[in-house]
Regions:
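C-terminal His-loop and adjacent cap/lid subdomain of alpha/beta-hydrolase
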Residues: 12-19, 24-183, 190-374
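N-terminal Lys/Arg-rich, disordered targeting/topogenic segments
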Residues: 1-10
């Protein structure tokens, strides 16, 4: 009798434990599906105002050959944000084959990112009622490639092909916007500089155009060759790359072509912890993050800012500090997808600074950080 009772108790305990484990697993799954693994519904018919959608694009691929889609939200205002996501880069055949070590290879978590920062529906977000055309990033080519790398594995550097097909597909839902903000973070910031002129040409009705590059500085003598031979970037884009500074080359060319009709902005934290790691790989073949690398990045950033202000006299600059490490003083990478409305010790947040520029009030903040010493 006692043995029967013991077995019954053990069975009950195991059932309870099983229920608890299942509940925890279910809770984790639900949390992930509502956050990191969130996916939007596919657009069917006319879009509902303020609702996010995934937009399947025929033939579009991520670098690993899996599906790629655009992300879209229709707003109430006749204004549009063209928003390039980031996530690393490939600059050589070796980094192409390295895949996830160097760049995002699939669409994992990209829907979730769209709702943060500048894309949020928060009341204090002046862009909350704009239409958003989001270009996710999973091709390792700064959204600028049309090529397929064939080595030990096949890698699709087809970011430009994806972007251009998606833009043409979604344009009928946007109409003819009178105001355009072209922006992107990290690799998407590099893409913003490379593709802003292309974007502007696709929306000729927009008379008020602002271009903002967030956290994009890497110095590399091989940018032109990478664009031509690895990514297979369209010639009109790769021809602009004549120095080791892709963003400076591209924004300078944009200003020379478009003049004062396009307001150009650049922001970056003054000791960007992620960019310095990639710069270390370019320079030394190894990613690293040290105080010395932070010092070097800070010097490079100062030179970059000086170049922008020389070549584009009316450029707006925002140098900021957030998430500073107590020992190395290295800082957060990118801001527009996250804490873009934090003041960061200035009169205006990065988000407000961008919106001010849209309204023809272009200013600069935080330049004193470029000379901060430790």
């Amino acid at each position: 009798m006692e043995k029967t009772r013991s077995k019954s108790k053990l069975k009950t305990v195991l059932i309870v434990l099983g229920i608890v484990v299942f509940a925890i697993a279910l809770g984790i799954f639900v949390f992930l599906k509502q956050s990191f693994l969130k996916t939007f519904p596919e657009l069917e018919g006319e879009p509902e105002i303020g609702k996010w959608y995934d937009i399947p694009v025929a033939g579009a691929t991520s670098s690993d050959g899996s599906e790629w889609h655009g992300i879209f939200r229709k707003g109430t205002e006749n204004k549009a944000v063209i928003y390039f996501f980031g996530g690393g880069v490939s600059i050589t055949p070796e980094t192409s084959e390295g895949g996830k070590e160097f760049y995002a290879t699939s669409m994992l978590a990209q829907d979730f990112v769209a709702q943060g920062g500048v894309g949020s529906s928060a009341e204090n977000n002046p862009f909350k009622d704009w239409s958003f055309i989001v270009i996710p990033y999973a091709t390792g080519d700064f959204h600028a490639g049309t090529g397929i790398y064939e080595g030990k594995k096949t890698v699709y550097h087809t970011g430009y092909s994806n972007y251009s097909a998606y833009i043409e597909q979604i344009k009928p839902y946007v109409g003819e916007p009178d105001t355009l903000l072209v922006t992107g973070f990290s690799a998407g910031g590099f893409a913003t500089s490379l593709l802003a002129d292309d974007v502007i040409g696709r929306f000729p009705s927009a008379e008020n155009v602002t271009v903002c590059v967030d956290s994009s500085l890497l110095l590399y003598d091989g940018w032109h060759d990478t664009a031509v031979y690895l990514w297979k970037t369209p010639t009109e884009i790769s021809d602009r790359l004549t120095t080791d500074n892709l963003v400076l080359d591209s924004l300078t060319a944009l200003h020379e072509k478009r003049g004062s009709s396009v307001k150009i902005l650049f922001d970056c934290s003054y000791r960007d912890d992620t960019l310095m790691q990639y710069q270390s790989y370019i320079d030394n073949g190894k990613m690293d993050r040290t105080k010395e690398l932070g010092d070097s990045f800070q010097r490079d950033l100062k030179e970059m800012v000086n170049g922008l202000r020389t070549n584009i006299p009316d450029v707006g600059i925002y140098i900021w500090c957030s998430g500073e490490d107590a020992d190395t003083h290295n800082t957060q990478h990118t801001i527009i997808s996250y804490n873009v409305f934090d003041k960061l010790g200035n009169d205006r947040s990065v988000g407000e600074w961008i919106f001010d520029a849209v309204n023809n009030d272009v200013k600069s903040y935080g330049l004193e950080l470029l000379d901060k010493a430790f």
